[in-house]
Swiss-Prot record:
It comes from Chlorobium phaeobacteroides (strain DSM 266 / SMG 266 / 2430). The gene is rplS. Disulfide bonds: none annotated. Belongs to the bacterial ribosomal protein bL19 family. GO terms for biological process: translation. Transmembrane segments: none annotated. GO terms for molecular function: structural constituent of ribosome. One of its GO terms (cellular component) is cytosolic large ribosomal subunit. This is Large ribosomal subunit protein bL19. InterPro entries: Ribosomal_bL19, Ribosomal_bL19_CS, Ribosomal_bL19_sf, Translation_prot_SH3-like_sf. This protein is located at the 30S-50S ribosomal subunit interface and may play a role in the structure and function of the aminoacyl-tRNA binding site. Keywords: Ribonucleoprotein, Ribosomal protein.
């Protein structure tokens, strides 16, 4: 039974997204259906948590919109995700960045930048 579950998860897993870690600033293009029309909606923010593995992996993204903190839990393997772009890699010393919830203004999105070395 366990092998069957692994086969199903492996077949549904999406590998077309970059590696996402807590502290990264990401821009996610989501498909939104309104009536008969379908459009893309961008959600840009800091990844404060990732959870699960394989087909059940989710990330929590937080942004500040008009002075109000907005968090969205996004299943990474959802068919409603068009693309995920990592805008900035952040250096986080924690696995969960829930302390950002208590911060206001620019400090709420401030995570130290991480140097990324491209392999040649």
């Amino acid at each position: 039974m366990d092998q069957l579950i692994q086969l199903v998860e492996a077949s549904e897993a999406r590998n077309d997204f970059p590696a996402i870690n807590p502290g990264d600033t990401v821009k996610i293009q989501l498909k939104v259906i309104e009536g008969e029309k379908e459009r893309l909606q961008a959600f840009e923010g800091v990844v404060i948590s990732d959870r699960g593995a394989g087909g059940s992996k989710t990330i929590t993204v937080r942004k500040i919109s008009h002075g109000v903190g907005v968090e969205r839990i996004i299943p990474v393997n959802s068919p409603n995700i068009e693309s995920i772009t990592v805008l900035k890699h952040g250096k986080a010393r924690r696995a969960k960045l829930f302390y950002l919830r208590k911060r206001t203004g620019k400090a709420a999105l401030k995570v130290k930048a991480r140097k990324v070395v491209e392999k040649a």
